[in-house]
């Protein structure tokens, strides 16, 4: 609550109120975390214990200690400053560099990214979000819940979500499968290819396939897949046009 009060004061100093038309503002019209830290620090240094206050000096001190790293310390490079996204028509978030970071830092950055995606998918609309190597985020149940909510609601805003992962078993881990199982029943369009060495029963149960449907992709065939759309099923052969095949190259993805 104290942080909320301080943020309101900071916004008021910058001329931002409930009456402000935020659609007319750019990223640099907003204050940064270092400015928030400076405001709280000034409040702490000038604290008058002789007057009645909504908070104590000790509480302000604890807030400063908790925020220091992300406002002025080593984590400030991730959180303090204005966004460098000038055109959001095509944005790639490379998260490889933070996968080895502490869990708290990684989760905070992931929450920022998912919040941005949520706004584009569900508020702006007509947006496609692709999540590659999704197994890396399955340990964060908040992220899984975010994505599940995306997938349930994006169609209403003409948006779409694409999820890619290495192995289906990653979604079946204890403590996770209760959240991930709905992800396979939500998509309107599904392209299902041969599952490789995955157990057939597990594959059919997870993706809710009939035995006859599974038999169409039981054996490895390049480009052959089962396409599901509502109650319709098609056995497809997927071929890349020549002009797109050139974009893929011949180095096996390297």
Features from the language model and the residues they span:
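Acidic, low-complexity intrinsically disordered tails
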Residues: 250-254
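Short, glycine-/Ser/Thr-/acidic-enriched flexible segments
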Residues: 96-99, 135, 168-169, 197-198, ...
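P-loop NTPase motor domains
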Residues: 1-159, 163, 216, 220, ...
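Short secondary-structure boundary/capping segments
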Residues: 12, 17-24, 145, 177-180, ...
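Short, surface-exposed polybasic-aromatic patches that bind anionic ligands, especially phosphate groups
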Residues: 239-240, 249
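Conserved ATP-driven motor cores of ASCE-family P-loop NTPases powering translocation/secretion/packaging/pilus
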Residues: 141-142, 146-236
């Amino acid at each position: 609550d104290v942080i909320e009060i301080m943020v309101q004061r900071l916004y008021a100093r910058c001329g931002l109120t409930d009456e402000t038309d935020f659609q007319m503002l750019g990223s640099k019209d907003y204050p940064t975390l270092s400015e928030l830290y400076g405001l709280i620090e000034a409040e702490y240094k000038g604290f008058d214990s002789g007057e009645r206050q909504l908070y104590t000096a000790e509480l302000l001190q604890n807030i400063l200690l908790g925020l220091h790293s992300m406002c002025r310390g080593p984590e400030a490079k991730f959180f303090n400053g204005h966004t460098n996204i000038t055109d959001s028509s095509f944005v790639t978030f490379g998260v490889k560099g933070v996968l080895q970071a502490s869990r708290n830092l990684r989760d905070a950055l992931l929450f920022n990214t998912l919040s941005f995606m949520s706004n584009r998918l569900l508020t702006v609309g007509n947006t496609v979000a692709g999540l590659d190597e999704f197994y890396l985020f399955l340990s964060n149940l908040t992220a899984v819940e975010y994505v599940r909510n995306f997938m349930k609601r994006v169609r209403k805003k003409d948006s779409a979500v694409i999820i890619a992962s290495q192995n289906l078993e990653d979604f079946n881990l204890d403590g996770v499968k209760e959240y991930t199982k709905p992800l396979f029943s939500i998509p309107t369009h599904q392209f299902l290819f041969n599952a490789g060495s995955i157990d057939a029963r597990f594959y059919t149960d997870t993706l809710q396939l009939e035995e006859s449907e599974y038999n169409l992709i039981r054996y490895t065939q390049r480009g052959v897949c089962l396409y599901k759309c509502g109650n319709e099923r098609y056995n497809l052969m997927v071929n890349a046009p020549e002009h797109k095949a050139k974009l893929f190259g011949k180095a096996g993805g390297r």
